[in-house]
């Protein structure tokens, strides 16, 4: 399948596989970005076009999921200029040694008819803001065929031995 890639920011990188056997394409940050507490979208600096009948899924990288997201601690500060307070200004970094933060990539979906900029949703549960540098592998993308289904409303469904759902079969 051919996927068209349109750069929206100079720092945008083409998604690429880390190894020949990789199932997913790594996604990179296009510029330095501060990750504040809570949810936010990290723009990747590109748009794409894929064939009809497919979707792209954005997933976390396993290292970030198991160890926390890598970044650089930011110290917030307030700037006062001519009597005005400017809060939330990008702070200075306490260290250029990376740390791990309690921040996760939230799974996302891209439909085949979406043409705007691609972004990664993150949720920072850490109380500290941190910087992710441009070129950081932030998430991964896979492509999947989407089937069109025909729905039919019925009064009854066929019976099975299953019931309960949501963990009802246990863990062992």
Each PLM stretch: what is its role?
Residues 1-172:
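DUTPase catalytic domain/fold
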């Amino acid at each position: 399948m051919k996927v068209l890639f349109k750069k929206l920011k100079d720092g945008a990188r083409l998604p690429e596989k880390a190894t020949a056997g990789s199932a997913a394409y790594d996604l990179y940050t296009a510029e330095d970005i501060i990750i504040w507490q809570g949810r936010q979208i990290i723009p990747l600096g590109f748009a794409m076009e894929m064939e009809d009948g497919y979707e792209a899924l954005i997933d976390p990288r396993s290292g970030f999921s198991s160890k926390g997201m890598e970044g650089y601690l930011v110290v917030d500060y307030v700037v006062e200029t001519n009597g005005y307070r400017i809060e939330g200004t990008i702070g200075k970094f306490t260290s250029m040694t990376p740390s791990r933060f309690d921040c996760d990539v939230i799974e996302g979906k891209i439909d085949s008819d979406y043409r705007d900029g691609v972004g990664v949703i993150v949720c920072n549960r850490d109380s500290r803001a941190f910087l992710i540098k441009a070129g950081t592998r932030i998430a991964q993308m896979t492509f999947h065929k989407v089937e069109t289904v025909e729905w039919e409303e019925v009064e009854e469904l066929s019976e099975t031995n299953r019931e309960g759902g949501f963990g009802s079969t246990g863990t062992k």
